[in-house]
Amino acid sequence: MAFTPFPPRQPTASARLPLTLMTLDDWALATITGTDSEKYMQGQVTADVSQMTEDQHLLAAHCDAKGKMWSNLRLFRDGDGFAWIERRSVRESQLTELKKYAVFSKVTIAPDDERVLLGVAGFQARAALANLFSELPSKEKQVIREGATTLLWFEHPAERFLIVTDEATANTLTDKLRGEAELNNSQQWLALNIEAGFPVIDAANSGQFIPQATNLQALGGISFKKGCYTGQEMVARAKFRGANKRALWLLAGSASRLPEAGEDLELKMGENWRRTGTVLAAVKLEDGQVVVQVVMNNDMEPDSIFRVRDDMNTLHIEPLPYSLEE
């Protein structure tokens, strides 16, 4: 990517975030084009893409035959096909899996590094962008296209925008916002995704979890009414037979080091500590607080106390901005 990422700053929680423009270099874009693209994606992901309108973007999972996610995808219609955003660390392996059956269909599946991914969030983000685009996405119309640019709207943890655009427009946007917005890298967007309860699947956790273990059913990412797709049987069984015992949790507190993706944590049991869960992502905020996204048993007590392994500091459960009740 010729567009240079912005230098890192310590991320800030959404409630205190000043207007911020971010380069999303830890995320990556991919596309599917061709006459069979809708039919092909319908047979590969958990969401009902045939029902998707031009105005929507969806979180969907791409699973293996056992229902374990290669990755989750932020999916939207793009040209005559679809584009999606996923973690850069999983894109190559995810595309390899997605292409396995493509020889039988009129589709082209490819990474897209020509376009640039930017995030805009924080204080009066909408007002700042309103000067630069003729229309902005909203709850009713979550995707807007203008020239070479696609804008995606997110409600949680506070209103924010993801911009998919060409290098020239990215440079223009940066020049226009540079004076009023702080610049940051993708760690800030990661912190917002953790706060929003959007699961982050990096390479360490690819192929490890069924979608429901990361709350995808609560985020509208699974259709239980659509036709066959890879892994569907296991995903359906988890719902209808109650086979899923895990959920995605948000923890906050202190830690002397950041746990890495794939690492476990420790749960306080009386005087002892027991290993539990799998970390998906963690970020240290500018106020010193550590936020951790972790997959654990779905019956954790709300007052449970956790820690990074062998650490002196502790973490506690924070509420997510959505309900897991079905």
Curated annotation (Swiss-Prot):
Pfam families: GCV_T, YgfZ_barrel. It is found in: Cytoplasm. It comes from the Bacteria. GO terms for molecular function: folic acid binding. One of its GO terms (biological process) is tRNA processing. Folate-binding protein involved in regulating the level of ATP-DnaA and in the modification of some tRNAs. It is probably a key factor in regulatory networks that act via tRNA modification, such as initiation of chromosomal replication. NCBIfam families: PRK09559.1, ygfZ_signature. This is tRNA-modifying protein YgfZ. It comes from Escherichia fergusonii (strain ATCC 35469 / DSM 13698 / CCUG 18766 / IAM 14443 / JCM 21226 / LMG 7866 / NBRC 102419 / NCTC 12128 / CDC 0568-73).
